[in-house]
Amino acid sequence: KCDLLLKGGHVIDPVNGIDEPMDVAVSGIKIAAVAEDIPSNSAARVANVSGCYVTPGLIDLHAHSWGSVAAMFPDEMCLPYGVTTMLDVGGAGWRNFDDFRKARIVPAVTRVFALLNIVGAGMAGDDAEQNVSDMVAGATAEKILERRDILVGIKTAHFRGPGWENVDRALEAAER
């Protein structure tokens, strides 16, 4: 017997080539079955999702959950919209990543990956992102190597120049 049966939803599952009304049985955190007309008595709970789309978790590849006034807690901005995995794009830098991880990543149900801002302060405001002396390639590379389970790249943005110092520092960090 499954824990939950999603009954009558329109399943869209590109990996398995499904784009039609189907039922979805869930046991624990696993999909137990996807089929037409799964009997309701095979589930502890039944949710009528007729008129709704049912799809594997979506991925948000550009989100802000740290370092800006628009930043939101991952679960608040993701889960209500079917997003189960997100990429924070540079809210934290090498100096404040550990705080970001403790405050936002660890408590979240949403799976969070991040780009580490080349600026140690992260997206702490426009002036902070102009601080070339806070763009430390070595510290950025060390933090990425320390947390490769979460950190998947380097963010550089909002730099007014002159020149390409922010990009040069990010490339230096990436090459380490």
Each predicted region: which residue ranges?
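Short coil/turn connectors at secondary-structure junctions
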Residues: 1-2, 41-44, 49-50, 54-56, ...
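Histidine-rich, glycine-flanked metal-binding segment
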Residues: 1-5, 10-55
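Fold-independent oxyanion-binding glycine-rich loops
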Residues: 8-9, 14-15, 34-35, 49-50, ...
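Di-metal (Zn2+ and/or Mg2+/Mn2+) metal-binding site signature of metallo-dependent hydrolases
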Residues: 52-75
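Short glycine/serine/threonine-rich phosphate/pyrophosphate-binding segments
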Residues: 67-71, 95-96, 164-166
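Divalent-metal coordination cores built from histidine and acidic residues
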Residues: 75-161, 172
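Charge-patterned, long linear interaction tracts outside catalytic cores
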Residues: 163-176
